């Protein structure tokens, strides 16, 4: 009986250790949380989410020409050549897991150029509402999603929009770099923030 109890205790101890290791392993991959408190959602996790419901991914535009010493693509209010390369690389990785999506951008040169290089030929719809970064952006997202309820959506917008959404939805301080993104979805007329997109 004593031997059985010892064996049982050892089994429980090993089980707890395994659970802890599994949790640590998970935190090293797609299950990790960012230091800002947002869940980190990588490409594979995003693809799994998209199988459950259509996702809305909002990206900050690529590197601005007027705030960089790198070569401009063309217009000074647009993005740099490096920005185009970064956007194309991100788009290729994203499309490998989420090939089917509708593409939108705000009506600025830098977001339009970023979306164009990201998509590699996909039709782009420019919507000036995506420049508005208060509660209005939720109305715009819901409207876009209602036009094609079963489609994933990619939106190119601005850092202050992403910062506002993270704070408003999860009380998180999010200071996005170029091409950083947030993952959202619409359910029963409400917009939910799932986490921060991490390109892996």
UniProtKB/Swiss-Prot annotation:
Listed EC numbers: 3.1.3.-
Domain of life: Bacteria
Alphabetized GO MF terms: phosphatase activity
GO biological process, one term: lipopolysaccharide metabolic process
Class of this enzyme: hydrolase
One GO term describing the cellular component: periplasmic space
The entry's keywords: Hydrolase, Periplasm, Signal
Pathway annotation from the record: Bacterial outer membrane biogenesis; lipopolysaccharide metabolism
CDD domains: HP
Keyword Secreted annotated: no
Localization of this protein: Periplasm
Family that this chain belongs to: Belongs to the phosphoglycerate mutase family. Ais subfamily.
Name the UniProt record assigns to this protein: Lipopolysaccharide core heptose(II)-phosphate phosphatase
